[in-house]
Every structure is written in C-alpha cells, then in structure tokens.
A protein has these predicted regions:
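Histidine-centered catalytic micro-motifs
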Residues: 38, 43, 147-156
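Alpha-helix N-cap and loop-to-helix initiation/capping positions
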Residues: 125-129, 133, 161-168
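Acidic (Asp/Glu)-rich catalytic clusters
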Residues: 54-63, 96-103, 130-150
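Generic enzyme active-site microenvironment
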Residues: 82-83, 149
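C-terminal active-site subregion of NodB/CE4 polysaccharide deacetylases
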Residues: 2-82, 88-89, 93, 160-293
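A short, conserved beta-to-alpha structural element at the edge of catalytic cores
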Residues: 102-124
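Acidic/aromatic-lined carbohydrate-recognition and catalytic surfaces
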Residues: 83-88, 94-97, 101, 110, ...
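A short acidic, helix-capping loop that chelates divalent metal ions and anchors anionic groups
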Residues: 116-119, 156-161
Length: 293
C-alpha cells in the first residue's frame, strides 16, 4: 500500500510539472538543467534481465551521464547510474549490460569490507550469498565505464560516530581506494544517506568534489552543489515506477523527509543532522516549485 501511495503521489507531481513549467516560461523564470541520479545495490542473476530492460528504457528516454556531470549541451532528461556497496553481483550482472549499451556508472566502494559479505544492515533485500568485490576485482574495472567513489571503510552511520572516528572513515577510504586503483578518488556516498553539517565539512576537507545522499532531491548540476541527492531504484520496480523515478517524479519525497524530521525530531533537525541536501537560499516561490521546473 505504501509503495502504491508513493507512485500515486509521484504521478500527481509529475503531471503538475507540465503546467508549472509552461507558466514559468511565460513569466520568464529560467528552466534549469536537471540531473536525476539513480542508485542500486545488488543485481542478482535472477533479475539481470529486468535490469537490462530498465537500461533499454533509460536509453530510449534519457541521456545517461556520469554522476559527477556538471551540465552541458544536452536536451531532455539527463540521468546517472550509481551502485552502493560494490557487490560482486553488480560486476557480474549489471556491468556487462551497461557495457553493451556503453552506459557509464559510478560504484561506491566500502574499502574496509573488500571480499567479504556485508557486515552492516542492508537497506534492501539482497542476495544472501552476495559479497563485496575484492581488491583484484575493483582494480580490474575499466575506467572508461566505471568511476569509483568511496563509501567509507566500515559502512557506519557517520553522524553517530565520534568526530575523529568519522573523519578517519572519510579520509582513509579515499586515500586507500586511490592508492589501490591509481585513480584520484573524488566522489563519496554516505552509508544509509546519513550525514550532518560537520560530516559534510569533513568530506570537503578530505578532498572530495561531490558527495551523495539517498533522498531524491532535484539536482541542478550547474549550481555547484556539493551534496547530491539520489533516488533508490530496483529491477523489481514496475515500468511506471521506474519511469517516474528516472523522470524526477519522486522529488516530493525530499520535502516529506524534511517535514517528517522537523516534526519528529526538531532539535536534531535544527542542529543540521538530516539527509536532505542543503542548498543555497532561494526565493520562497522558486524553492517550492523548483522540483517541477
């Protein structure tokens, strides 16, 4: 029921976007270029065909770019594909399908868990025999297809750790992954999407260019935002569900998440411990409608 309700609300916001966008053009509000970032976890062999079907639909309806895309001469929908946790199933089942279609992706690696089953609570149902890719597999990934990003060392809730421990998770995961692969790792995703303002500041100091949460906020790549939101996707999503997600129809959930946190834990919200990315100030009308434009 909860899933169906999300689909219904997303349909409403997606349809509302048409007249709002038209009205914005009439009154002279510039339509900003948007990026929708999808994120997956594991891709078991049993659902590989469904993942491939989603990639076909994505190619038909959007231009696929890297998760670090800063904007450019692209018309229509723009999407990026990311994977958290660097599971072997992603390398075995997702990457061959992406390679066939020449679709780039970003994989976020928990460097302290290489070659082992996940020792953390999973956000989605995953194949029980899946493990994190080992060092040799990570090093073998083609840089023309895969951009690597850090996902800390041990996949903790960063905002709950002592500050120095959190700093070590952030800094060491970047330096170790860079040394292992020979790449200058500049991207990181937060485990569980958990961060606060201090954690975000640590990431900047550690040398990351962009970091990623799990709230489906609208990403405006030309605005120079440091924290980018993403929308969770599964090969089990229905065609309508996947279309709405890749089209940015789930952006309203960032508002719902912010309101829920403010109501349930006002002190935590005011202290800045939240998943929703912080953006530069905007006018009230523009802020409310920005996800529709």
């Amino acid at each position: 029921m909860k899933r169906q309700l999300k689909i219904a609300i997303s349909c409403v916001f997606y349809v509302l976007g048409w007249p709002v966008s038209a009205l914005a053009g009439v009154v002279g509000i510039e339509k900003k270029q948007r990026l929708v970032i999808l994120y997956y976890h594991d891709i078991p062999a049993a659902i590989r065909a469904r993942f491939a079907r989603q990639m076909d639909k994505l190619m038909q309806r959007a231009t696929v770019v890297g998760a670090d895309w800063r904007g450019g001469a692209v018309k229509g929908r723009v999407c990026a594909i990311t994977f958290d946790d660097a599971f072997v199933s992603v390398l075995d089942n997702a990457l061959p399908e992406l390679a066939k279609r020449r679709l780039p992706c970003t994989i976020f690696v928990p460097v302290g868990a290489l070659g082992r089953p996940p020792g953390w609570t999973m956000e989605t149902n995953y194949a029980p025999d899946d493990v994190v890719a080992d060092q040799d597999l990570i090093k073998s990934l083609p840089s023309s297809l895969v951009t690597l990003g850090a996902h800390t060392l041990t996949h903790p809730f960063l905002s709950r750790l002592p500050r120095e421990t959190a700093r070590a998770e952030i800094e060491k995961s970047r330096t170790l992954l860079s040394a292992m692969t020979g790449q200058d790792v500049r991207l990181m995703s937060f485990p569980y999407g958990d961060y606060d303002h201090e954690v975000a500041a640590m990431c900047k100091t550690a040398g990351y260019d962009l970091v990623y949460g799990i709230v489906p906020t609208t990403v405006y790549p030309r605005d120079g935002e440091f924290i980018r939101g993403r929308v969770a996707v599964s090969p089990d999503d229905s065609d309508l569900e996947f279309f709405l997600k890749m089209s940015g129809g789930y952006w309203w959930m960032s508002l719902a998440s912010t309101l829920k946190q403010a109501c349930l834990s006002p002190h935590t919200f005011l202290m800045g411990k939240k998943q929703a990315p912080k953006r530069p100030p905007q006018g009230k009308v523009e802020r409310w409608w920005s996800g529709l434009l």
